[in-house]
Curated annotation (Swiss-Prot):
Short motif Gly-cisPro motif, important for rejection of L-amino acids, span: 142-143
Recorded name of the encoding gene: dtd
Taxonomic lineage: Bacteria, Pseudomonadati, Pseudomonadota, Betaproteobacteria, Burkholderiales
Family, per entry: Belongs to the DTD family.
Domain note: A Gly-cisPro motif from one monomer fits into the active site of the other monomer to allow specific chiral rejection of L-amino acids.
Name assigned to this protein: D-aminoacyl-tRNA deacylase
SUPFAM superfamilies per UniProt: DTD-like
Cellular location(s): Cytoplasm
Organism of provenance: Paraburkholderia xenovorans (strain LB400)
């Protein structure tokens, strides 16, 4: 599975002009399931997303995770948005191939699993809508962006 995480001051996702998820300071994670991914890969990716140290401590060093945003135990927001295009094969030609992405039914199942697992482990989880045409807006903080990937 893949997650492109961005440290944000705020972010929101809309579907048909309706806000489906919004957070203040935290992480926006664009999430993609690849062919052959499993719940175990989703669990490993979620552990990375929740534990990845991308927020600055008092000394200015990236040493804090979204679970401990301020060093005093305050959790930041986590906005999860499905994005199958992260799995695109761009190695040949000028049109991406999405063959590496999980089929839609499997992608939805794994994204739903990922969201449920995140909600069980983190207090502030918002989402987009799988397969919908979404408008995502955010205010990057830094910017700080990381590509995280786990394999089945």
């Amino acid at each position: 599975m893949i997650a492109l995480i961005q440290r944000v001051r705020r972010a929101e996702v809309r579907v048909a002009d309706r806000v489906t998820g919004a957070i203040e300071a935290g992480l926006l994670a664009l999430v993609c399931a690849e062919r052959g991914d499993t719940e175990a890969a989703a669990d490993r990716l979620l552990a990375k997303v929740l534990g990845y140290r991308v927020f600055s401590d008092a000394a200015g060093k990236m040493n804090l995770s979204v679970q401990n945003l301020d060093g005093a135990g305050r959790a930041g927001g986590l906005l999860l948005v499905s994005q199958f295009t992260l799995a695109a094969d761009t190695n040949s030609g000028l049109r991406p191939s999405f063959t590496p992405a999980a089929p839609p039914d499997e992608g939805k199942r794994l994204f739903d699993y990922f969201v449920a697992a995140a909600r069980a482990k983190h207090p502030v989880v918002e989402t987009g809508e799988f397969g919908a045409d979404m408008q995502v807006s955010l205010v990057n903080d830094g910017p700080v962006t990381f590509w995280l990937q786990t394999h089945a």
